[in-house]
């Protein structure tokens, strides 16, 4: 007898990479909007989380459009995590566009144009369309031929007869030969479930009817049930696009298939800068759709991290962009106190690296440094997320290290310590592993001290 053994699926290969904010699942607020001490991957920062909860409510009720929020606080206090939690609370349907201040500087595109591009990435458009469709299982597929009008012995397809069956009956359709080409492209055969759009003639193969599911043992087919209702029905289709998608679609129209147009596309590798005129035209079309009730504007969130990297030109443009009729909610983050604004001639210091006229427009959310107990809880959560086990003494040692140096350094020591404990044949990370990691990897303060002592060389 031939031996057959079942291959067990390797679960470890499915696990996604553990990133810096993998553990963040939301703001962790209760029904009254009050922050729970440890919830949604957050520990502490109750006031900041509650403030962000109010911002989320304002965004959902569409009362926050064109306003800006600044999350300010020392490094490693969860500013980026708060912005990520806001995006998760809003859900996947609301556009969220995260960028870093230095991303706006490019040799090909102007700074202001790059900022406007990201502005429009953060504004969604929900288009609702009612389409007439014929949906059912194919029970007949007969092309009808006719004499070639151009002469000769060949024949052309004049039309195609398609029979469709649904739960409530059958219909036989006489379709144009162009639709027959679409049917051939989709490789439709009898027994497939398809739908045909009445207006455009687009054909979509949904899958194979589940009545044929037992025909073969090994198949890569997707079996679907027989469509409910009548063959001819009206379907409401909702599409979510951003204004930037519409800009790009209109900025790069599809050229012909001739050699000149193909050469033109090859010779133009540079990024296309979308003009203000094109954006204005797109805005007019969008406004028309909104007035007709066909589309709905969904203001999203533009998150700009390290806002102190922006210069005076961008800040001036940002002031104007926030006042425009179509603007998203802008969330800024800065870990600077009083610092010089880039591009200012007088070198005057401003709070958080933002000019005073922009600071007036911002709602400022403050994040505070973590205490030792909070650091201990965060390290414990990260360890469980990475599948590591620490002894109580090792956790205490790491939390003290996080308090004296930085939380990031303490969290970064976890994985190397896990490797050392596995190499030594231990199932738990001990104080010895932490001390060895501290010896092998310097933190910023010890590294600076070494440089000061050696002065001219490492």
Curated annotation (Swiss-Prot):
- Recite the UniProt keywords alphabetically: Activator, ATP-binding, Chromatin regulator, DNA damage, DNA repair, Helicase, Hydrolase, Nucleotide-binding, Nucleus, Transcription, Transcription regulation
* Source species of the chain: Candida albicans (strain SC5314 / ATCC MYA-2876) (Yeast)
- What is the recorded name of this protein? RuvB-like helicase 1
Provide a Gene Ontology MF annotation, just one: DNA helicase activity
Give the matching Pfam families. TIP49, TIP49_C
- Return the GO cellular component terms, semicolon-separated: Ino80 complex; NuA4 histone acetyltransferase complex; R2TP complex; Swr1 complex
Q: For this protein, what reaction is catalysed?
A: ATP + H2O = ADP + phosphate + H(+)
Q: What does this protein do?
A: DNA helicase which participates in several chromatin remodeling complexes, including the SWR1 and the INO80 complexes. The SWR1 complex mediates the ATP-dependent exchange of histone H2A for the H2A variant HZT1 leading to transcriptional regulation of selected genes by chromatin remodeling. The INO80 complex remodels chromatin by shifting nucleosomes and is involved in DNA repair. Also involved in pre-rRNA processing.
**Domain of life of the native organism:** Eukaryota
User: Which SMART domains does the entry link to?
Assistant: AAA (SM00382)
Q: How does it assemble?
A: May form heterododecamers with RVB2. Component of the SWR1 chromatin remodeling complex, the INO80 chromatin remodeling complex, and of the R2TP complex.
Q: Does the keyword tRNA processing apply?
A: no
Q: Which InterPro entries match?
A: AAA+_ATPase (IPR003593), P-loop_NTPase (IPR027417), RuvB-like (IPR027238), RuvB-like_C (IPR041048), RuvBL1/2_DNA/RNA_bd_dom (IPR042487), TIP49_P-loop (IPR010339)
Q: What spans are recorded as compositionally biased (Basic and acidic residues)?
A: 1-18
Q: In Gene Ontology terms, what is a biological process of this protein?
A: regulation of transcription by RNA polymerase II
Q: Which SUPFAM superfamilies match?
A: P-loop containing nucleoside triphosphate hydrolases
Coarse class of the primary localization is nucleus
- Residue numbers binding ATP: 73-80
Cite the residue spans of the region called Disordered: 1-20
């Amino acid at each position: 007898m031939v031996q057959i053994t079942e291959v067990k699926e390797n679960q470890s290969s499915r696990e996604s990479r553990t990133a810096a904010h993998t553990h963040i699942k939301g703001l962790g607020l209760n029904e009254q909007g009050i922050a729970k001490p440890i919830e949604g991957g957050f520990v502490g920062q109750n006031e900041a989380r509650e403030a962000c909860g109010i911002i989320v409510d304002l965004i959902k009720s569409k009362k926050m459009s064109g306003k800006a929020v600044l999350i300010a606080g020392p490094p490693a206090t969860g500013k980026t995590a708060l912005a990520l939690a806001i995006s998760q609370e809003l859900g996947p349907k609301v556009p969220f566009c995260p960028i870093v201040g230095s991303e706006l500087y490019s040799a090909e595109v102007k700074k202001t144009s790059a900022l406007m591009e990201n502005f429009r990435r953060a504004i969604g458009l929900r288009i609702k369309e009612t389409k007439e469709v014929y949906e059912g299982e194919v029970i007949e597929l007969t092309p009808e031929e006719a004499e070639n009008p151009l002469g000769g012995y060949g024949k052309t397809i004049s039309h195609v007869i398609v029979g469709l069956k649904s739960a409530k009956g059958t219909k036989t359709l006489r379709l144009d030969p162009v639709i027959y080409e679409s049917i051939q492209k989709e490789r439709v055969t009898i027994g497939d479930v398809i739908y045909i759009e009445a207006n455009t003639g687009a054909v979509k193969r949904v899958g194979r009817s589940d009545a044929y599911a037992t025909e073969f043992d090994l198949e890569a087919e997707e079996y679907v049930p027989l469509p409910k209702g009548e063959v001819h029905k009206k379907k409401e289709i909702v599409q979510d696009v951003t204004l930037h998608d519409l800009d790009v679609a209109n900025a790069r129209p599809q050229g012909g298939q001739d050699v000149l147009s193909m050469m033109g596309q090859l010779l133009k590798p540079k990024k296309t800068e979308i003009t203000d005129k094109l954006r204005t035209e797109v805005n007019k079309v969008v406004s028309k759709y909104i007035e007709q009730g066909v589309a709905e504007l969904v203001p999203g969130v533009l998150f700009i991290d390290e806002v102190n990297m922006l210069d005076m030109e961008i800040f001036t443009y940002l002031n104007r962009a926030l006042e425009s009729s179509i603007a998203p909610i802008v969330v800024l983050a800065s870990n600077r106190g009083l610092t010089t604004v880039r591009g200012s001639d007088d070198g005057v210091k401003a709070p958080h690296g933002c000019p005073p006229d922009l600071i007036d427009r911002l709602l400022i959310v403050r994040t505070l440094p973590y205490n030792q107990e909070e650091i201990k809880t965060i390290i414990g959560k990260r360890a469980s997320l990475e599948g590591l086990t620490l002894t109580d003494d090792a956790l205490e040692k790491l939390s003290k290290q996080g308090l004296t140096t930085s939380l990031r350094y303490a969290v970064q020591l976890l994985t190397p310590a896990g490797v050392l404990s596995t190499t030594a044949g231990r199932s738990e990370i001990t104080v010895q592993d932490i001390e060895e990691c501290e010896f092998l990897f310097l933190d910023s303060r010890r590294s600076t001290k070494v440089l000061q002592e050696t002065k001219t060389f490492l």
